[in-house]
Amino acid sequence: MGDWMIENKVRDVVKKLKPYVPGKSKEEIARAYGIKPEDIIKLGSNENPWGPSPKIKEKILDEIDKIHQYPEPVNPILMKELSKFLNVDEENIIVGGDGADEIIDTIFRTFVDDGDEVIIPIPTFTQYRVSATIHNAKIKYAKYDKEKDFKLNVESVLNNITDKTKVIFLCTPNNPTGNIIENRDVERVINETDALVVIDHAYIEYAKKEYDWTQKAPEYDNVIVLRTFSKVFGLAGMRVGYGVANKKIIDYMMRVKPIFSLTRLSQVCAITALRDREFFERCVRDGIKSREMLYNGLKKFKDIKVYPSEANYLLVELKTMKAKEFCEELLKRGVIVRDCTSFDGLGDNYVRVSIGTFEEVERFLKILEEIIS
């Protein structure tokens, strides 16, 4: 049996699929460059540099003896804590494993048939395109205007709406540009279509509260807000995501969502993180402070342009170097940032820099001075 037989069985959309390119890990860089993992600064994956609540370790140890048992498909304690944290009813929440990616995939499995149209403004989170392609949807691209600091061109969204449009993705704050979408523009999109409007709020904790659509989502028939524990809660390795929408949307999605995708350990970590409000608030406060420190430091370099952000990362445009060369120079010195070449709608001279601890930001800025000078 030759490989050609496998080729004949693979779906055409998978053959053509341009896969998602994840950020590099400390372990990968340690192996490649001979640097100790503890000496590497990771500013490439939009993680919480202070990690999860210190109370989580004890709770994981308490749960270890139960991992031979299946988890609860819907954990009532987690739902209660989420409801309290978000100030929305439990019936308006859906929780999944694999971060918000599972919720995105569940949206496609619930609402999108072959050939249906989805609208994706670019540049944005690549997983929307990947999921749309896998589910054989027709992608129509809208845009963020670079000359306006990547403000959403709302007309480009509205002009792409047809009677075949099923889903519209609005990432706010947007990844990788960091900007929010103005409330009036979100509202225009919602009101001018009966398609499902997905408002991705993965980074909303770092933005001004007035831009948060979570509590408003259940009031609409065509809105779902995506949230995650991977960012400010420091649980990227536990893969917990959730959505908030009206009960009808949630009920249909629950029919197709994987049953046991959220592990016992993931559930107990999420519950503990929600209960440690003091640690959460400190991470938000310090994250914003780190972002400001990073932004002010980057603005001093004349050979780069840094864009304002409401997230936990900054988009940087390089004026004299390509992203690949720039990232390589940083990697040699033990610093990971994200090459944005793989993001649709950006060129090969953009990188994304995540927040770090205050010490990490200081060290990064000193290393950057070496490279640019």
UniProtKB/Swiss-Prot annotation:
One of the Pfam families matching this protein, by short name: Aminotran_1_2
Record GO biological process: L-histidine biosynthetic process
Catalytic activity: L-histidinol phosphate + 2-oxoglutarate = 3-(imidazol-4-yl)-2-oxopropyl phosphate + L-glutamate
Positions bearing N6-(pyridoxal phosphate)lysine: 231
Obligatory cofactor(s): pyridoxal 5'-phosphate
Enzyme Commission identifier(s): 2.6.1.9
Listed InterPro entries: Aminotransferase_I/II_large, HisP_aminotrans, PyrdxlP-dep_Trfase, PyrdxlP-dep_Trfase_major, PyrdxlP-dep_Trfase_small
GO molecular function, one term: histidinol-phosphate transaminase activity
Family: Belongs to the class-II pyridoxal-phosphate-dependent aminotransferase family. Histidinol-phosphate aminotransferase subfamily.
Protein name per Swiss-Prot or TrEMBL: Histidinol-phosphate aminotransferase
Organism taxonomic ancestry: Archaea, Methanobacteriati, Methanobacteriota, Methanomada group, Methanococci
